[in-house]
Amino acid sequence: MHAYLHCLSHSPLVGYVDPAQEVLDEVNGVIASARERIAAFSPELVVLFAPDHYNGFFYDVMPPFCLGVGATAIGDFGSAAGELPVPVELAEACAHAVMKSGIDLAVSYCMQVDHGFAQPLEFLLGGLDKVPVLPVFINGVATPLPGFQRTRMLGEAIGRFTSTLNKRVLFLGAGGLSHQPPVPELAKADAHMRDRLLGSGKDLPATERELRQQRVISAAEKFVEDQRTLHPLNPIWDNQFMTLLEQGRIQELDAVSNEELSAIAGKSTHEIKTWVAAFAAISAFGNWRSEGRYYRPIPEWIAGFGSLSARTEN
């Protein structure tokens, strides 16, 4: 069967701190075109690789990878809330297959996800519940982080499993590209924030969640005025990364350490490993070609914003 892929940056700042209307129209047009291509493909199953931002995963237990056998989106920053339509038996079979391939994949029957999962489903499929989905969390902010090599191997294992299903499979990678918004770090946290990072942040009071969101919005507004206030975006790195993906050279990223990536492009750039997993997965279906490449640095969203599709040729 055929597979399709789309990787897309996300930002909680969409609708809160937006770029000029012409830029917004351009991005919306790119997303609309991707949505049309996906609709024409008519996926029967979605595999969504996405990160978390201390909304569902915490330091009480922080896996490098986790497959949601059941998952619920919390609706942060105005994103869609509700249950994701996970096919339980298929998710369980996927977990077993990945484990047998040598990848230690955690599973959760009550995975809590945020805008990192919700936005791509909203933007590209029109909602959380449109197509059965296997949601795969990849840790992109909480050290110690998985590296490129292990993430690639995860994608390959999931790709091999889904290639046996006789279904039209859509792989989505969500996050990146270069960026470093104000995300708390355990090593620098005060007592209150440390408690939140250790797990109490899973059920934040509404007032505290609003304050947290406002801090991100304020940081974006300052970044627009002075891009020295946060780690700068890195369009050169972002475009080099997208070229590696397009050329099927993702294995070259194995040599890039987590420390090097953080220094080059920002500490939240590790979200791009969702793109690596997606491209590794589609490779299990045979030859593919990329299409629909788009990139623009958008300071208002504190992100090097990218969009890239691929389709199998067999």
UniProtKB/Swiss-Prot annotation:
HAMAP family: MhpB
Gene Ontology biological-process entries: 3-phenylpropionate catabolic process
Broad enzyme group: oxidoreductase
Pfam families (UniProt xref): LigB (PF02900)
Gene name tied to this protein: mhpB
Family annotation (NCBIfam families): PRK13370.1-1 (NF009907), PRK13370.1-4 (NF009910)
Molecular functions (GO terms): 3-carboxyethylcatechol 2,3-dioxygenase activity; ferrous iron binding
Superkingdom of the organism of origin: Bacteria
Key words, A-Z: Aromatic hydrocarbons catabolism, Dioxygenase, Iron, Oxidoreductase
Cofactor: Fe(2+)
Family to which the UniProt record says this protein belongs: Belongs to the LigB/MhpB extradiol dioxygenase family.
Biological role: Catalyzes the non-heme iron(II)-dependent oxidative cleavage of 2,3-dihydroxyphenylpropionic acid and 2,3-dihydroxicinnamic acid into 2-hydroxy-6-ketononadienedioate and 2-hydroxy-6-ketononatrienedioate, respectively.
Active site: H115, H179
Self-association state and partner proteins as the record states: Homotetramer.
UniProt pathway: Aromatic compound metabolism; 3-phenylpropanoate degradation
Catalysed transformations (reactions): 3-(2,3-dihydroxyphenyl)propanoate + O2 = (2Z,4E)-2-hydroxy-6-oxonona-2,4-dienedioate + H(+); (2E)-3-(2,3-dihydroxyphenyl)prop-2-enoate + O2 = (2Z,4E,7E)-2-hydroxy-6-oxonona-2,4,7-trienedioate + H(+)
TM regions (residue ranges): none
Protein's name according to its UniProt entry: 2,3-dihydroxyphenylpropionate/2,3-dihydroxicinnamic acid 1,2-dioxygenase
Lineage: Bacteria, Pseudomonadati, Pseudomonadota, Gammaproteobacteria, Enterobacterales
Record EC number: 1.13.11.16
